[in-house]
Each structure stands twice: as C-alpha cells, then as structure tokens.
Amino acid sequence: MTMLKLALFFLVVSLIAGLFGFTGISAASAGIAKILFVIFLIVFVVLLVMALAAGKAIL
C-alpha cells in the first residue's frame, strides 16, 4: 500500500472507531494519520523546492 492509501485507511478506521466509542483505537489511528500527514507535507515541500531550484515546470 502506498502511504496515501494508509493515511486514508487510518482516517476511516479512526472515524469508525470514534462512532463506536473506542477512544483508544480512535486516538491511535488519528495519531498515525497525523504523522503520515506531516510526512506527506514535508515530502511535498522538499520536492517543490527541488523543482523550483532545478527550474523545471511543476505542473
């Protein structure tokens, strides 16, 4: 699975667990989703800076 699919999976798991009131599972899944979000954000910024430094078209 790609990291994006894992992030979406943990988001869905945390929402479902939240509906059923399993706060431990919900908090753990939400925590993993937050960590994956930060990782994706850092990778995006690094790649954006690299593309701008290389002078290549981004989109």
Swiss-Prot record:
Compartments (UniProt record): Cell membrane
TM regions (residue ranges): 6-26, 35-55
GO cellular component: plasma membrane
Protein's membrane topology: Multi-pass membrane protein
Statement: the UniProt record of this protein carries the keyword Cell membrane: yes
Keywords assigned: Cell membrane, Membrane, Transmembrane, Transmembrane helix
Top-rank lineage group of the source organism: Bacteria
A Pfam family per the record: DUF1328
Family according to the record: Belongs to the UPF0391 family.
HAMAP family for the chain: UPF0391
Protein name, UniProt field: UPF0391 membrane protein GbCGDNIH1_2123
Organism field: Granulibacter bethesdensis (strain ATCC BAA-1260 / CGDNIH1)
